Amino acid sequence: VQYVDFTDLAMAENATFRVTAQKTTDLRELTNDAEWLALWGMADTPAMDTANAAGITGPQRASSTTLAGIMQELLDFSKSTKALELSGLYKSIDVDGQPTILSGKVILPAKGPIKRYILVSHYTIASNKEAPSNIFSLEGLLVKLGYALIIPDYIGYGATADKVHPYLVMELTATNVLDMYYAVVPFLEKAGCAPEHDDIYLMGYSQGGATTMAVQHAIEHHDKPIKIRRVFAGGGPYDIKYTYDQFVETNWASYPCAVPIMMQGMVVGNKLDLDMSKMMQPFIYENLDAWVNSKLYTAGQINTLLGSHVTSDLLTEIGMDRTSKEVSELYKAMVNNSILTYSWTPKAPVFMFHSMDDDVVPFENAMRAKSKWKNANIQYSFGHFGNHQMGCVRFIYTVQTLLENDEKEENGNFTF
């Protein structure tokens, strides 16, 4: 990529994607970025990893067996790379279907050709400082391989941080993600930065894993003119109702902030006429704006503020009663937004990753996906890969390896 001032007003005129900030990042600097590393719990005890005991082999088998170790391997892989980060704005729609301006980031190789686009649906975040347009996303390390990553913020972050995030509202979020792709592609073509190939990768973990499958559905079901080379989906809540129901059935939430965030996302994103104060404990409902909607706190900080993993400490009797009118309506919305309820079978090849030790998104989600899509072209990678956070880092490490192998195969020198 030749150096271009993408923030130049002449380029912004009639542009589909308006760049608001541009910088070149030396990825070696990330190892010294304490705040960035802290978001990945690098100061905490390494997450559980039983790769050796499970006999994990293949691309998902990093040589390290700790969160810090695999993070270091990812950073070492990318350390000689410089990336061009473009934060910007594009047009999409809001929860009412009305026009709105959303934000996101494009990460390009600072020099050399662009091979393909990777359209990334990001994992669950809570604070606005974690929004892709405000930070270097972990998936951005894949820029080392010559790919350009397109990473939307979603409604509720970046340019729309004052809005409630419609968490796991699949069709809307898939539309928002695709709208950024449609905005970025002509913009970069106009700037002389078109990729060498016109097929793309889709990628996402956790919330992003389910969202990236919804993006694939939106492309294939509606015959969008986008060629998908491969989809990488990891740790996704493909069955939202089942995922939420586990909080109620077991009376335990290892990731307690997910309870109010999922409830609010369904209510706001689906425009449900439900009084959340009847379902949430008063101290949560009264602090929902301050703790969640302010976007000032990370998920870990919100978990600390909530002070309990016991679901009945978070929800009222009505909220815990799956037969109540309120919860029944909530569950209907969750079913309607679950990708597994769609009358659709993925066409493009998919790599689906899920840790059997996942403590946030139950592994059963992946098993239900495997049962639902038994006739699809899906490669499943299940194993004891550690908890949800560890699974995320291992997933990105695995995608890196798969992309390297894909490149070798494309160049005719792939070896098994």
Map each language-model feature to its residues:
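Gly/Ser-rich "nucleophile elbow"/oxyanion-hole loop immediately N-terminal to the catalytic nucleophile
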Residues: 108-114, 183-203, 223-226
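Gly/Ala-rich beta-loop-alpha elbow adjacent to hydrolase catalytic centers
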Residues: 204-208, 212
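Accessory cap/linker subdomain of secreted extracellular hydrolases
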Residues: 234-343
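Short, surface-exposed "cap/lid" segments of acyl-processing enzymes
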Residues: 95-103, 107-145
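Catalytic-loop region of hydrolases
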Residues: 1-112
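Short beta-strand/loop motif that positions the catalytic acidic residue
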Residues: 346, 351-358
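C-terminal catalytic histidine-bearing segment of alpha/beta-hydrolase fold enzymes
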Residues: 326, 331-333, 337, 357-360, ...
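Alpha/beta-hydrolase active-site loop
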Residues: 167-190
